[in-house]
Amino acid sequence: MAFQDLIIQIGSLGRFQILHMIFVLICHALSAPHTLLENFTAAIPSHRCWVPILDNDTASDNGSRILSQDDLLRISIPLDSNLRPDKCRRYIQPQWHLLHLNGTFPTVTEPDTEPCVDGWVYDQSTFLSTTVTQWDLVCGSQALNSVAKFIYMTGIFIGYIMGGHLSDKFGRKLIFTCSLLKMAITETCVAFAPSFLIYCSLRFLSGIFSSTLRTNSALLILEWTSPKFQALVMALIFIASGVGQTLLGGLAFAFRNWHHLQLALSVPMFLLLIPTRWLSESARWLIMANKPQKSLKELKKAACVNRIKNSGDALTLEVVKTIMKEELEAAQTKPSPLDLFRTPNLRKRICLLSFVRFVSVMSLLGLLINIQYLSNNVFLLQCLYGVVCIPANVLGNFSMNYMGRRMTQLIFMSVLGISILAVVFLPQEMQILRVFLSTLGGAISSASITSTLVHANELVPTIIRATALGVVGIAGSAGGALSPLLMILTTYSASLPWIIYGILPFLGGLVALLLPETKNQPLPDSIQDIENKRKSSKEAKKDVVAKVTPL
């Protein structure tokens, strides 16, 4: 626990931490929209089969030129169960008799239809081009749209597996910089993908680098601040993500061609590589990696930037070694991911945190990546999601500081579940109320995820924190990967996926109550810290029982 003494000595939230925070928050604001990018780049516009009599300018048979578009559509495309033009079938021959409403040409049998063998015609009033229109991901191929999102989420899943371990082994800064570079390259290349297979492959790689980037960027801030500021830091990270969502909505409104939108969000990431040369490695990680000299250098640098007088002279290698003696001894043994499950208390924490992350991320992404199903104006709803994240996370930070981490998760997740379930049973005509509840759900989901991340960071030891957060992140990524696949269930019931999204947050909030409260508690540095705390709490309970038991 002694590292907190060093942080206080150099300034727990000074200019050094603020400059770091600004840079990392900008990175989050530009990287976060890529998770939701397919709300626009893979949007499904209105469509119908291509038919010669409608879409071939040279068609003039049977006097079709004198007929209106509605009449031509009526004789070319059958109606679906909602009495709207079918999106996936057309008549083999024009049904001229359908123009006569007086029954002069009665129909004995249903006219023969066929699939859209000549392709589709897409409505371009909202989107000029999407991946759906480029590769015809509609009708029989519509499930591929969900598969593409699943592949990206699988990349995030793999990234959490690899990123946490690599970060604990090679450091936060190196993995952060490499991930930023590779994500910028892959996302830029996505815009030029010549085929759907290459597109999915590049998005898969981008997902890997995205998760490692975000994990390490959060650690680079959190491990330089004291516990009382960590809830604020996580709230600011999600506020930055909200700014990114608002930016995405604005850019998507400006760039209706998916190639241009992809480049508008990807190319600026290359500029973020320039400030990384001044980024400092986590002094906490350097100590736990048995590199006290490098840690001392970073601590002195932080003290200098924070203008803490005389602290640089007081910080010596002997002081660092003395304060962190137990941690340095623990660092001699390199931890492995299996260490997370060897001791009972840490194992319990990891399992419970993983479940909470799984259900919270599944519901969050279910809401955020399917906004096309919730509102007619996807640009407005996306911007609203981003804007309301700011007050929601401020409220979440206030709640965590006064009610604690566990109660905050329970309350926020319950409200999220209620808002999703309410939207399910509202008719499409009540658009204003649907948008309001969807926006409320998006805001609350952001704040609930913030509280789960803060809680997770405070419950695992520094020596294996990145690996632990990676394992918990894997569970969240699994929920995120399954989230778009649930929309395939709409073929059975339009409400079924949303009912699942709405029920899961209630379960997550209840499970969060089984975890220890960490408000204003110092971060554990070693696995032994967690087990010792468990033993201390047991002994304290025994003492209480002994005092109240009559002789």
Curated annotation (Swiss-Prot):
The chain crosses the membrane at residues 6-26, 146-166, 189-209, 235-255, 260-280, 350-370, 378-398, 407-427, 435-455, 469-489, 496-516. Residues 27-145, 210-234, 281-349, 399-406, 456-468, 517-551 are extracellular. Gene3D superfamilies: MFS general substrate transporter like domains. Residues 530-545 have a biased composition (Basic and acidic residues). Specifically expressed in kidney, where it localizes to proximal tubules of the outer medulla (at protein level). Not detected in other tissues tested. It is found in: Apical cell membrane. InterPro entries: MFS_dom, MFS_sugar_transport-like, MFS_trans_sf. Sodium-independent organic anion transporter which shows high specificity for estrone sulfate, dehydroepiandrosterone sulfate, and the mycotoxin ochratoxin A (OTA). Transport of OTA is strongly inhibited by estrone sulfate and probenecid, and to a lesser extent by 2,4-dichlorophenoxyacetic acid (2,4-D) and salicylate. Transport of estrone sulfate is inhibited by various steroid sulfate conjugates including dehydroepiandrosterone sulfate, alpha-naphthyl sulfate, beta-estradiol sulfate, 4-methylumbelliferyl sulfate and p-nitrophenyl sulfate (but not minoxidil sulfate). Belongs to the major facilitator (TC 2.A.1) superfamily. Organic cation transporter (TC 2.A.1.19) family. This is Solute carrier family 22 member 19. It comes from Mus musculus.
